[in-house]
Swiss-Prot record:
One of its GO terms (molecular function) is oxaloacetate decarboxylase activity. It catalyses: 4-hydroxy-4-methyl-2-oxoglutarate = 2 pyruvate; oxaloacetate + H(+) = pyruvate + CO2. InterPro entries: RraA, RraA/RraA-like, RraA/RraA-like_sf. This is Putative 4-hydroxy-4-methyl-2-oxoglutarate aldolase. Pfam families: RraA-like. GO terms for biological process: regulation of RNA metabolic process. It comes from Aromatoleum aromaticum (strain DSM 19018 / LMG 30748 / EbN1). Substrate binds at G75, D76, Q77, L78, R97. The lineage of its organism: Bacteria, Pseudomonadati, Pseudomonadota, Betaproteobacteria, Rhodocyclales. Transmembrane segments: none annotated. A divalent metal cation binds at D98. Catalyzes the aldol cleavage of 4-hydroxy-4-methyl-2-oxoglutarate (HMG) into 2 molecules of pyruvate. Also contains a secondary oxaloacetate (OAA) decarboxylase activity due to the common pyruvate enolate transition state formed following C-C bond cleavage in the retro-aldol and decarboxylation reactions. Homotrimer. Keywords: Lyase, Metal-binding.
C-alpha cells in the first residue's frame, strides 16, 4: 500500500495527529502503516516478544518504553518474529539494537536510537492501553502511518 505522510496530512489535516519528529528509521521497510496495538514497558522487553510472537495481521506495534536510552527493547530476533508473523512495523519510544540486521528485514522499525545492551526480562508492563509520547496519544485500534517524513495517527483509516 503506497502512501506519503505529507499527502495524508494535506488531504486529512483535521483528522490526523502528527508525532513530533524524534524517530529514526531502522527497518528495511521505509514506509509502513496499520492498526495500532500498544505496549507500555520500561527497560523490559518480555511483552514485546509476546506481542511479536502473535499474529500481526499487518498491524503496527507501538512500544512506549518511557524514552529510555539505557537498553534496547527490540533486536534482530524480535524483529525477525515480527516479519514471520506479518507485522507491518514497530515503533519504539526507546532503543533497538542489531540495527544492521534489522535494516535488511522487510519490517518497518522506528526508534529513538540504538543501544547494544539487552533489556531485562521480568514480564512487567501493560498491553493495549492508550500511551502518549511525541505529543500524540496512540490508541489501540486507531491507525498509524510512518515514512521518511514522519509519523501520523488517525482514528480511522486514511487509505
Amino acid at each position: 500500500m503506497e502512501f506519503q505522510t505529507a499527502d495524508l496530512c494535506d488531504a486529512n489535516e483535521s483528522r490526523v495527529k502528527i508525532v513530533s519528529p524524534m524517530f529514526r528509521s531502522y527497518g528495511g521497510r521505509g514506509a509502513f502503516c496499520g492498526r495500532i496495538t500498544t505496549l507500555k514497558v520500561f527497560e523490559d522487553n518480555s511483552l514485546v516478544r509476546t506481542a511479536l510472537e502473535g499474529p500481526g495481521q499487518g498491524k503496527v506495534l507501538v512500544v512506549d518504553g518511557g524514552g529510555s536510552m539505557r537498553c534496547a527493547l527490540v533486536g534482530d530476533q524480535l524483529a525477525l518474529l515480527g516479519v514471520k508473523n506479518q507485522w507491518a512495523g514497530v515503533i519504539v519510544y526507546g532503543c533497538i539494537r542489531d540495527s544492521k540486521a534489522i535494516g535488511t528485514m522487510e519490517l518497518g522499525v522506528f526508534a529513538l536510537g540504538s543501544h547494544p545492551l539487552k533489556s531485562i526480562k521480568k514480564g512487567a508492563g501493560d498491553v493495549d492501553i492508550a500511551v502518549t509520547f511525541g505529543g500524540v496519544t496512540f490508541t489501540p485500534g486507531h491507525f498509524i502511518y510512518a515514512d521518511e517524513d514522519g509519523v501520523v495517527v488517525s482514528e480511522s483509516s486514511l487509505l
